[in-house]
């Protein structure tokens, strides 16, 4: 017996007189042994000076068994949370040394009461129906009394029965002997009950003890090792053959350039099977989870447990790898041998069970400690002259570390190696398919190379797994190619994307990437059809062109439980080529092969090349939609590098291959080939073809609205050296701009403090909050963005209804580029989610109600109906469908617009104060061509919709859709402007409530003064929203300020008087200046002016009193801040405000009149005027098409060029008045 002292982990806190040693015994289990704890007794003070004190010694010895089941000391690894074993009730009381929170008696009673009510839910439902007065507390009391009565009755019924029967027998005068009959019956009944109680208790207790034993102790599995040994003789040859095939294929694909070929010439694992030292189970896992620890050992050199006959027939493991170095004649083979393999390790296995084939969904594997490897490696000399490099000092350690470094990130704790058994067994794949996506690529435009020349573009379409599902034809020498090609892709989840990449074809050099785009497929769930849509292509953050496409979703037929026996009608197909065998009869010839999949005589997919392998294995599939599968034909063509012609082909009808897949007959001979066979299979699911043609984001009903309170951004950087950012923020979703803020000029830390609303179409939506750098003379640049996953804000109640979500925290997150690179810039915002209130009564005649995609904030570029969700959205134009789905024809010719609703639904929607207003510009009538229609809403300075050019005089059908969010329907106003270049031809303002009430049941005609008119249909999807006070209509308006007088002003002149005047500033900008009153300390002004108040909660309104001086700077007499929060709508508010100079009082009277005030005025002199035309003459929103802009003019949105001229006039006038005044003196 050998011993080795190991310090205890808790030695620092232990008794210094205690010593713990681990005694390693020659046990069967590696790492086993016993722990010996020795407690020594200190010597008495009188014996401390003696060399052998009598009082010192060992006072206590404890011996504890320590098996290897719990790890092996230094090699123990941290177990990840998902692989941790469940703790027993005793262990749960203290986790990692931290005691759990004590539970009060009140909490225990409340929890027990809830569990009690749940157990008696049926009784509760019945009593609630007939006894509504019976509360949960009373019900619990009644049931407890009933249980108590029944318990005591069961305990005492035998005594009661004995007494009653004895009384009856005596009363009937049966005599004394009758008591023996009663006693016999009672004794027999008692024995039966007693036996049943003992048996049940014994079974329960035995089960409890076995469960505890499974939890705490490991189990030897000699029976399993015996079975593995017998099974190993049969299984090992086929396993070694399969490993050889797979390894040869991997080696052939990864041959270094200086090696001609690599192949396994010999591979065997020997005749001795792997063994399990122990198994430890964890019975307290979830019902659908199995977890256990295994002690695995593979030591074929240990023959101590084999019989003489087994030793004589024993074959040891051996791996021989042949390397062929050099080329042709100058090549030479070099064998590499690996012998005497052994392995030992502790493996934790976690199996997730399911209730269908293959009944195990995933298997998680992780080593709880580093395994131990042993081997003999002979890279040179072979069997006879081979030298084991393990004898070289340090090399074995180096190789072992490399093995651990390779396997560690894969399956050493805390890493877990998960096997998807369901997918591996073929149960996933097409079984989980939701349907197929039909993608029709129409055309593209705007493509050019770096020098502006012509290109030869083609488009590659990939799925989310980056697998190519189609490649378009090459359009030569054109920047506006026309494709008109259709591609299909199997859709397994609505969270998938289509990736579009446009390349410039070149015969000599490699093809050049012109641009890429991502089409998220999330909105196919709500809007299965998208027609005539555009998507912007970007390259390094810049727009380089766009593609025009149609997209449809074809859903599979729901599974009825019946087995599909034949292929008929439309369906989703998954065609798989597995492998080929025996391509060459000569083993020395190893062809490099690849396969092409053929569907209906059309090549649809090409596999990867397998180098120098006689039995290549691809296991590659191609999924598509077949409009008719009954007469479809499938085929596989095998090609080799030696020839451009097919080496062999295999053709079969879809019906025959489907039947062969059912029976497992998957091997087919290669025709026109000297040898070889191919294994292929097919899966089929019937589908429903979608023949709808109408599609627009404005027709998709939002499930709710997301509100983003955007506070600020920090550390922004302009890409133009030496210039600060003119920044604004916007919300992107479904490749569409949903909302945007005002531009803050020349500020790297802009502060917006704006509320933005955007529609949520599906729970898979992803919004991108982007910060842009405004450029008046070119395209706006993206500074950075951050994604917002709407699924994080959606919660459902017990009945499945969506619930509101409010996060009181403000999030500050870094901004990243389109490539995901994060910088120093950050953005601060807060999100809320409000579900829509759409009911069945609000649904239209058509499919579930339509509702706007979004719409607000337009830009310089416009797009037609945008597709959908996002990954890295490109800056497609304005909101919801600016220049929207143009010229979309309705599928029902009798219906004027898809937005129209029944009058009952309209009245129900108008009961709500907020929601998304969708609109359909059905047709127009103009007298002059090349005009445009712009729509403005409430306090938004940017148009929410901009139509395409109206070129047809007289009248024409348009059908362009848009959508916007209405905050307060009672006060909301919508303005329609007809534009001719930079000139406003006509304008019409109406209440949004009137638009919906008159235009939701039938189209509403809106006429302009010059005889032009438009026909519009509306729809309201109500979304109840609790507005913040700063958003409300009552919080803004037009102030009428009466400057009455000032008293007791301080003297600034030598004569003891002052020449006072007052300057009023709103948000840091001068809005009014009173007249100057000479030589007085108590001036009476009696002046009045009007100014717009954007927000009485946040605006800073200041009055500054000055003393006028000729030729010198005016003296400041004092100032005061006017509290606008005191203002009430349509009421006069009197102010008597002392100046901050502690002398002087200013008297004002202010009246606030309700009015929508552009939110661009809230930023004061930090906002940037982006154009010269907007809702008012003094401020504009987004630059409209064809309208000139004033770039980088930092004004406040209140003062215009006329205001600047007025200041110059007043300054000159005051100068002349001063000169005249001095002369008068």
Curated annotation (Swiss-Prot):
Residues the entry annotates as binding Ca(2+) 2: 1053, 1107, 1109, 1115
This protein's UniProt keywords: Calcium, Endoplasmic reticulum, Lipid transport, Lipid-binding, Membrane, Metal-binding, Phosphoprotein, Repeat, Transmembrane, Transmembrane helix, Transport
Gene3D superfamilies: C2 domain
Domain SMP-LTD: 217-422
GO molecular function: lipid binding; metal ion binding; phospholipid binding; protein-membrane adaptor activity
Binding site for Ca(2+) 1: 1053, 1059, 1107, 1109
InterPro entries reported for this sequence: C2_dom, C2_domain_sf, C2A_Tricalbin, C2B_Tricalbin, C2C_Tricalbin, C2D_Tricalbin, SMP_LBD, TCB1-3_C2
Pfam short name (any one): C2
Biased composition regions of type Polar residues, renumbered to the chain: 1-15, 43-65, 869-890
UniProt feature, compositional bias: Basic and acidic residues: 16-25
Membrane topology label: Single-pass membrane protein
Cofactor list: Ca(2+)
PTM annotation (Phosphoserine): residues: 843
GO cellular component, one term: endoplasmic reticulum membrane
Domain C2: 413-534, 559-668, 685-803, 1019-1137
UniProt-annotated location(s): Endoplasmic reticulum membrane
Transmembrane spans: 167-187
GO annotation terms (biological process): endoplasmic reticulum membrane organization; endoplasmic reticulum-plasma membrane tethering; ER to Golgi ceramide transport
Name of this chain's protein: Uncharacterized protein PYUK71.03c
Species of provenance: Schizosaccharomyces pombe (strain 972 / ATCC 24843)
């Amino acid at each position: 017996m050998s011993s080795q002292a190991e310090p205890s982990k808790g030695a620092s806190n232990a008794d210094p007189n205690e010593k713990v040693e681990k005694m390693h015994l020659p046990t069967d289990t590696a790492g086993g042994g016993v722990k010996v704890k020795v407690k020594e007794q200190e010597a008495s003070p009188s014996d401390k000076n003696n060399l052998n004190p009598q009082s010192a010694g060992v006072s206590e010895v404890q011996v504890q068994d320590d098996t290897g089941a719990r790890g092996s000391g230094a090699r123990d690894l941290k177990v990840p949370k998902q692989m941790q074993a469940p703790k027993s009730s005793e262990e749960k009381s203290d986790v990692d040394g931290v005691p759990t929170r004590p539970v009060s008696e009140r909490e225990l009673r409340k929890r027990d009461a809830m569990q009690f009510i749940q157990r008696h839910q049926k009784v509760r439902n019945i009593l609630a129906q007939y006894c509504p007065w019976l509360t949960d507390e009373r019900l619990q009391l009644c049931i407890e009394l009933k249980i108590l009565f029944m318990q005591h009755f069961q305990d005492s019924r035998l005594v009661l029965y004995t007494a009653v029967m004895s009384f009856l027998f005596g009363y009937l005068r049966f005599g004394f002997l009758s008591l023996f009959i009663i006693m016999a019956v009672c004794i027999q009944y008692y024995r039966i009950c007693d036996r049943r109680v003992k048996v049940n208790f014994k079974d329960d207790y035995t089960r409890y003890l076995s469960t505890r034993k499974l939890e705490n102790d490991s189990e030897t599995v000699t029976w399993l090792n015996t079975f593995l040994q017998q099974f190993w003789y049969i299984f090992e040859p086929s396993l070694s053959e399969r490993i050889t095939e797979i390894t040869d294929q991997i080696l052939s694909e990864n041959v270094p350039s200086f090696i001609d070929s690599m192949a396994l010439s010999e591979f065997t694992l020997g005749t001795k099977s792997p063994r399990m030292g122990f198994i430890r189970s964890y019975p307290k896992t979830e019902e659908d989870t199995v977890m256990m620890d295994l002690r695995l050992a593979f030591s074929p050199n240990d023959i101590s447990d084999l019989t003489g006959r087994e030793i004589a027939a024993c074959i040891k493991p051996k791996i021989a790898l042949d390397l062929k170095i050099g080329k042709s004649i100058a090549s030479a083979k070099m064998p590499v041998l690996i012998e005497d393999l052994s392995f030992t390790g502790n493996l934790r296995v976690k199996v997730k069970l399911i209730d269908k084939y293959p009944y195990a969904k995933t298997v998680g594997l992780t080593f709880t400690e580093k395994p131990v490897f042993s081997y003999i490696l002979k890279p040179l000399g072979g069997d006879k002259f081979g030298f084991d490099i393990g004898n070289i000092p340090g090399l074995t350690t180096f190789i072992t570390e490399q093995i651990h470094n390779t396997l560690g990130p894969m399956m050493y704790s805390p890493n877990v190696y998960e096997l998807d058994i369901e997918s591996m067994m073929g149960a996933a794949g097409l079984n989980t398919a939701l349907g197929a996506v039909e993608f029709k690529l129409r055309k593209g435009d705007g493509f050019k190379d770096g020098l502006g020349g012509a290109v030869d573009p083609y488009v590659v379409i990939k799925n989310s797994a980056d697998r190519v599902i189609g490649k378009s034809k090459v359009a030569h020498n054109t920047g506006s190619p026309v494709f008109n090609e259709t591609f299909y892709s199997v859709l397994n989840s609505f969270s998938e994307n289509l990736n579009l990449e446009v390349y410039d074809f070149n015969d000599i050099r490699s093809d050049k990437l012109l641009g890429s785009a991502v089409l998220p497929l999330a909105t196919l769930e709500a809007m299965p059809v998208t027609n005539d849509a555009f998507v912007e292509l970007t390259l390094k953050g810049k727009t380089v062109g766009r593609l025009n496409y149609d997209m449809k979703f074809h859903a599979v037929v729901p599974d009825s439980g019946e087995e599909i026996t034949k292929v008929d009608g439309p369906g989703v197909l998954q065609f798989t080529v597995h492998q080929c065998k025996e391509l060459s009869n000569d083993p020395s010839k190893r062809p490099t092969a690849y396969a092409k999949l053929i569907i209906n005589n059309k090549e649809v997919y090409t596999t990867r090349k397998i180098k120098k392998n006689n039995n290549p294995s691809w296991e590659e599939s191609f999924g598509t939609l077949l409009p008719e599968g009954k007469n479809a034909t499938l085929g596989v063509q095998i090609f080799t590098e030696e020839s451009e012609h097919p080496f062999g082909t295999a053709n079969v009808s879809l019906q025959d291959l489907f039947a062969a897949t059912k029976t497992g007959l998957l091997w087919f001979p290669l025709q026109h080939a000297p040898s070889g066979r191919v294994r292929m299979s097919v899966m089929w699911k019937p589908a429903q073809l979608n023949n709808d043609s109408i599609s627009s984001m404005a027709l998709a009903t939002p499930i709710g609205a997301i509100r983003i309170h955007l506070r600020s951004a920090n550390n922004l950087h302009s890409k133009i050296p030496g210039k600060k950012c003119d920044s604004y923020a916007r919300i992107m979703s479904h490749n569409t701009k949903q909302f945007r803020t005002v531009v803050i000029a020349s500020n790297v830390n802009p502060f917006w403090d704006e509320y933005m609303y955007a529609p949520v179409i599906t729970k898979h939506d992803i919004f991108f909050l982007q910060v842009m750098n405004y450029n008046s003379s070119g395209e706006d640049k993206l500074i950075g963005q951050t994604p917002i996953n709407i699924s994080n804000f959606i919660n459902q109640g017990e009945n499945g209804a969506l619930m509101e979500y409010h996060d009181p925290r403000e999030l500050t997150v870094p901004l990243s580029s389109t490539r995901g690179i994060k910088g120093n810039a950050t953005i601060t915002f807060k999100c809320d989610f409000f579900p829509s209130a759409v009911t069945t009564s609000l649904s239209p005649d058509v499919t579930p109600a339509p509702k706007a995609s979004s719409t607000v904030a337009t830009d310089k570029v416009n797009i037609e109906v945008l597709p959908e969700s996002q990954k890295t959205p490109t800056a497609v134009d304005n909101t919801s469908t600016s220049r929207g789905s143009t010229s979309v024809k309705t599928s029902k010719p009798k219906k004027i617009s898809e937005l129209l609703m029944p009058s009952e639904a309209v009245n129900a929607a108008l009961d709500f104060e907020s929601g998304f207003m969708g609109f359909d510009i059905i047709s127009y009538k103009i007298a002059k061509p090349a005009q445009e229609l712009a729509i403005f809403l409430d306090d938004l300075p940017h148009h929410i919709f901009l139509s395409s050019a109206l070129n047809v005089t007289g009248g024409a059908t348009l059908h362009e859709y848009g959508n916007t969010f209405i905050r307060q329907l009672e006060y909301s106003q919508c303005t329609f402007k007809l534009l001719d270049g930079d000139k406003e031809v006509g304008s019409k303002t109406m209440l949004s409530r009137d638009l919906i009430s008159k235009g939701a049941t039938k189209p509403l005609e809106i006429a302009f003064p010059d005889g032009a008119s438009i026909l519009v249909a509306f729809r309201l999807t109500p979304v109840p929203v609790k507005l913040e006070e700063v958003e409300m209509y009552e919080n803004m308006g037009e102030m009428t300020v009466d400057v009455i007088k000032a008293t007791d002003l301080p003297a600034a002149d030598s004569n003891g008087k002052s020449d006072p005047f007052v300057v009023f500033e709103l948000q840091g900008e001068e809005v009014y200046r009173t007249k100057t009153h000479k030589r007085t300390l108590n001036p009476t002004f009696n002046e009045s002016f009007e100014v717009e108040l954007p927000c009485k909660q946040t605006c800073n309104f200041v009055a500054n009193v000055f003393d006028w001086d000729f030729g010198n700077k005016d003296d400041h007499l004092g100032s005061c801040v006017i509290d606008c929060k005191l203002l009430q709508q349509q009421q006069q508010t009197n102010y008597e405000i002392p100046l901050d100079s502690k002398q002087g009082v200013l008297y004002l009277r202010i009246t606030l009149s309700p009015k929508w005030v552009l939110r661009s005025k809230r930023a004061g002199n930090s906002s940037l005027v982006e154009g010269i035309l907007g809702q008012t003459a003094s401020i504009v929103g987004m630059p409209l098409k064809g309208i000139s802009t004033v770039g980088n003019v930092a004004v406040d949105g209140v003062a215009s060029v006329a205001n600047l001229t007025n200041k110059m006039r007043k300054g000159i006038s005051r100068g002349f008045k001063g000169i005249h005044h001095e002369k008068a003196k």
